[in-house]
């Protein structure tokens, strides 16, 4: 790893509410958090020949960690922060895993910059033949609420998993130490679904995932069920590809109160509504990745004319 160790690393950096960071040097050393310090849990596992290893966050959502011990973590060997992405590299004797958290903040393309959408790309490079690999990624309902202990409405549709507060009071608060408490978190992937924190716990204690049919008996996300406050939904997806992308987005319904008038997000000027915008954002994932890489390279080249240290700090500040 390089000597450059940011105080916190941006993972999702769309706006002050849709904002998730890694506060520790290693991505598996702690839960991911909102910039205010409150837990906003993203979680990731890499399965190598069926054996799970953590590469992102922690699984246990209890306050004291008593429910179960954490699974072994992959060795983190590199971190690079660019103007639009944070790239982590992990190593195992069977493979190398690269995970890219991309928020396409392209100032010359406001229709893209204003989208409340981030991408989690991963690439697995096998060290030898004969191994199987799969990846699990999930996002907790904490990203859709200020504090825990409230009922949530969930939904699944066309490769989308969705969660938000059952009671929607849009733009109900302001100030520094607040998280969003309205709107809906979306996870987009062909396998995207709604699960519960209990299912994570079941896997950790039983060594296997709960049967999907049994999960379906617990709630019906396809019809927009409401889960009581004592249940903690997570949006989950998995993939057995060597490279793939999970898209995570936030529909805040209204974005700002302007002279007592709730105003739409800027992206709606271009797309009309959230669903149209999200469909475009999903389709453009790979193209945006390439465009952001070119943008980052150009910015880095300019900043390195001052110094390499300036380029590192400048990329983080962007």
Show the residue positions of the predicted features:
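Short amphipathic beta-strand/extended segments with alternating polar/hydrophobic composition
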Residues: 53-59, 98-102, 136, 165, ...
């Amino acid at each position: 790893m390089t000597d450059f160790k940011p105080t916190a690393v941006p993972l999702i950096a769309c706006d002050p509410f849709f904002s998730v960071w890694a506060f520790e040097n290693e991505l598996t050393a702690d839960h991911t958090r909102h910039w205010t310090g409150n837990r906003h849990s993203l979680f990731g596992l890499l399965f190598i020949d069926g054996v799970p290893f953590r590469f992102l966050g922690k699984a246990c959502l209890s306050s004291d960690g008593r429910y179960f011990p954490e699974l072994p973590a992959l060795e983190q060997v590199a971190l690079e922060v660019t103007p639009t992405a944070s790239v982590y590299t992990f190593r195992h004797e069977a493979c190398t895993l690269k995970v890219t958290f991309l928020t396409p903040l392209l100032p010359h393309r406001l229709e893209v910059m204003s989208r409340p959408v981030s991408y989690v790309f991963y690439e697995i490079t096998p060290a030898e033949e004969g191994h199987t690999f799969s990846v699990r990624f999930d996002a907790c309902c904490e990203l859709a609420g200020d504090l825990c202990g409230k009922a949530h409405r969930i939904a699944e549709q066309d490769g989308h998993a969705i969660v938000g507060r059952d009671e929607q009071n849009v733009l109900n608060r302001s100030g520094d130490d607040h998280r969003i408490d309205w709107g809906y978190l979306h996870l987009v992937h062909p396998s995207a679904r709604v699960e519960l924190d209990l299912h994570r716990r079941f896997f950790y204690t039983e060594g296997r995932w709960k049967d999907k049919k049994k999960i379906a008996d617990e709630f019906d996300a396809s019809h927009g069920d409401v889960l009581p406050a004592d249940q903690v939904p997570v949006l989950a997806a998995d993939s057995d590809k060597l490279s793939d992308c999970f898209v995570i987005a936030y529909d805040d319904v209204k974005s700002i109160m302007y002279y007592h008038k709730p105003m739409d997000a800027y992206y709606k000027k271009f797309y009309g509504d959230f669903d149209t915008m999200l469909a475009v954002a999903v389709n453009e994932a790979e193209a945006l990745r390439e465009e952001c890489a070119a943008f980052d390279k150009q910015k880095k080249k300019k900043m390195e004319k001052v110094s390499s240290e300036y380029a590192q700090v400048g990329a983080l500040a962007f």
